[in-house]
Design a protein with these regions (language model features):
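N-terminal secretory signal peptides
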Residues: 1-12, 19-21
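Intrinsically disordered/low-complexity terminal segments and short unstructured peptides
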Residues: 16, 20-23, 166
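C-terminal alpha-helix/helix-terminus motif
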Residues: 21, 25, 270-273
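C-terminal segment of classical bacterial N-terminal signal peptides
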Residues: 26-31
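Carbohydrate-interacting regions of secretory-pathway proteins
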Residues: 33-274
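General helical structural elements
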Residues: 14-16, 271
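Extended, hydrophobic interaction surfaces within ordered domains
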Residues: 13-14, 250
Length: 274
């Protein structure tokens, strides 16, 4: 179901991203972290300074394998095909904020972008399930009940081992997904760039967070933690578990569903506190 709501201008979105990158590019990581209210760069493009893996085993594994390659954070199971995954978390914690991050993933991995996360991997997750019957952009309760606001699924068409097209199906009714707003599958497909870098932007604000996501300037989902209804969602319990602030994190899903040798890639991680 598509609800009318003004969309972020693609041109303005791209100009804002360029301006933010230019502002933070010359700042050392430590100095950038001290500037509140402005865009800061959480990833220097060369090292994993300012980041850490889950310190203890969680449901997805001991941490997965994370390294920097060609200016991007790369994640994969450790070793490939072992089922051993995990998360990479920012050392700095955020409560109310906006974040932009570029991603370029292989087709097949189930990943995620974590908000207000703790070292146990509990969080509000922006799904990055880039596989058949997957979803990218809606909200899921990782370790906080398993509530799910996905409004539709995505499926891939693969030719000669390469993803060539994406389709959408299994559209949910508003009472099933519970979103304040969702784009249509057609809008999502139009926004996504196959085999290219895609920019995810997320705004997270409030005691019971109001979370909005965009892909390449297209508004994808608006989730209201104060009013969301789902059998597995208890807003007070989630708030007690996560607190007011948490890390930003990226995920390598554990288990056998992750294709052997598949990788996820992230870069240009810009955050500003609100």
């Amino acid at each position: 179901m598509h609800y009318k709501s003004h969309l972020v201008s693609r041109r303005r979105f791209l100009m804002d991203t360029v301006a933010a990158t230019a502002t933070t590019a010359s700042l050392p990581l430590g100095q950038a972290l001290a500037v509140k209210g402005e865009w800061i760069n959480l990833f220097d493009g060369k090292t994993l300074e300012g980041w850490h893996r889950n310190p203890q085993r969680i449901g997805h594994g001991t941490g997965g394998k994370w390294y920097v390659e060609d200016g991007a954070i790369v994640g994969e199971q450790d070793p490939p095909g072992s089922g051993n995954g995990g998360i990479l978390l920012s050392d700095r914690k955020f409560g109310d904020f906006e974040v932009k991050i570029d991603m370029n993933h292989d087709w097949g991995p189930c990943s995620g972008f974590f908000l207000r996360a703790n070292d146990k991997g509990q969080c509000f997750q922006v799904m990055v399930d880039f596989h058949d019957a997957g979803n990218v952009g809606h909200i899921y309760g990782e370790g906080t009940g398993g509530f799910n606001s996905r409004a539709f699924d995505i499926n891939g068409q693969v030719k000669d081992g390469k993803l060539v097209a994406i389709t959408g199906d299994n559209i949910r009714k508003p009472e099933e997904h519970g979103c304040v707003y969702t784009c249509t599958p057609e809008e999502w497909i139009k926004a996504w760039r196959i085999a290219k870098w895609n920019t995810l932007m997320v705004r997270c604000i409030g005691k019971y967070p109001h979370i909005t996501s965009w892909l390449n300037g297209q508004k994808i989902c608006e989730f209201d933690g104060a009013t969301f209804k789902h059998p597995n969602y208890d807003r007070e319990k989630v708030r007690s578990t996560l607190g007011e602030k948490g890390s930003i994190a990226v995920q390598v899903h554990g288990g056998g569903g992750w294709p052997k040798g598949a990788k996820v890639r992230w870069r240009n991680i810009l955050v500003r506190e609100l």
